[in-house]
A protein has these predicted regions:
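Conserved P-loop NTPase
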Residues: 38-107, 314-360
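P-loop NTPase catalytic phosphate-binding loop
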Residues: 1-41, 45, 53-54, 117-315, ...
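Basic- and hydrophobic-enriched, low-structure N-terminal and domain-boundary segments
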Residues: 78-80, 91-141
Length: 360
């Protein structure tokens, strides 16, 4: 009995009560399970001192000693039935009876990651205090936010076809649902991926329409100057102002704009902290290195430290954004509908807003 384990032989025995198991056996076992006993002394005979441990109080409830620690657990219950359906119903009835008998604190609901995330559900979680909810953290199932004014520029990136443009469009729809007074400006490509926002947004232009782009920046800068003046004149702190959101479908195409217009965008991206401004810039993952190292607007975008990646692995972005993932997470390919949110020198895997409708 005592030498069996060294030869791969193990014994499992049962007894009706503590006196039904001889001492010679209990003295040579490495583990024991005790179901309901009459009092604490009977538990002690089998598994040692129980002290303040919660004792078994119903059928199937037991104590087990693991690494000198007593654990109270519920064994799997046999459920009668001729088929799976009958056994399922019997198990459900048993679970309901256990729930009715429970007198302790109610268990917390286990959060479950939804299959898809609607624009409206994220709009309901967003607000001037929290910021814009762009998705749900896959571990905590809590909303992940980017706050305009604290973050003034953020990249939305990934390979061709991952849904960058769709993501920008969904965020544009959402911020208007959060506050219809949001000032939403869109700079689009010739593919007109953001055209659906043209009617409800404040201003819309294609990047090839230089005069219209100039007018968009003029409107934004005018609003910023107005806010600065109001704050200067206000006797008390201005608590709330509508967000200023600028969506750029492909910021790399801004290279074709005149230098003075690019300089205006540079000012909007870097000199507007605290004024509710956020510039969301779509850019292909393959263009990041050259854009971030050779272009002033790229330097501005990278220096914000925030990005939402919609494809590839965390490793693909480590040259630009830090993360604290384990090795397996770093090398894991993003599934469709998920992203990595980079911010505050870390990365979080998220389920993206309405991301099942991926576009370009």
């Amino acid at each position: 009995f005592s030498e069996g384990p060294s030869k791969g032989i193990y014994f499992v025995y049962t007894g009706v009560n503590n006196t039904g198991v001889p001492y010679k056996l209990t003295a040579n076992v490495s583990g024991a399970i005790s179901f309901m006993q009459a009092d604490r002394s009977e538990y002690s005979t089998l598994i040692g001192q129980v002290r303040d441990t919660r004792l078994p109080n119903r059928v199937g409830n037991a104590l087990i000693k693991v690494n000198q620690e007593l654990i109270n657990f519920q064994k799997a219950m046999y459920e009668p039935g001729e088929n799976d359906k009958e056994r399922e119903m019997a198990l459900k009835a048993e679970a309901e009876s256990m729930t009715e008998a429970w007198r302790g604190k109610p268990a917390l609901k286990i959060p479950v990651l939804p299959e898809s995330i609607s624009v409206k559900s994220m709009a309901d979680l967003s607000g001037s205090e929290q910021g814009i909810a762009v998705g749900l953290d896959t571990e905590s199932i809590e909303a992940v936010y980017v706050k305009p004014g604290e973050t003034t520029a953020m990249a939305v990136t990934g390979r061709v076809g991952c849904g960058k443009s769709t993501m920008l469009q969904r965020i544009g729809q959402m911020v208007l649902e959060v506050d219809e007074n949001t000032l939403l400006y869109c700079l689009d490509t010739e593919k007109k991926s953001l055209a659906k926002l043209q009617e409800k947004g404040t201003a819309y232009a294609r990047l090839s329409e230089v005069e219209k782009v100039q007018d968009v920046f003029a409107q934004i800068l005018k609003e910023l100057m107005s806010r600065m003046q109001r704050r200067k004149e206000a006797a008390t702190k201005i608590e709330k102002e509508p967000w200023i959101i600028l969506l750029i479908d492909d910021i790399k195409e801004c290279n074709s704009l005149p230098d003075d217009i690019q300089m205006q965008l540079h000012r909007i991206m870097t000199k507007t902290k605290g004024y509710g401004v956020l510039v969301l810039c779509g850019i292909r993952q393959g263009n990041l290195f050259n854009f971030y190292t050779q272009d002033q607007l790229g330097v501005d975008l990278k220096s914000s430290g925030s990005a939402l990646a919609l494809s590839d692995t965390a490793v693909h972005y480590e040259g630009f954004y830090k993360n604290n993932f384990a090795q397996s997470q770093r090398n894991a390919e993003l599934e469709k509908g998920f992203g990595i949110f980079f911010a505050d020198n870390g990365g979080r895997k998220i389920k993206c807003i309405d991301s099942q409708e991926a576009g370009r």
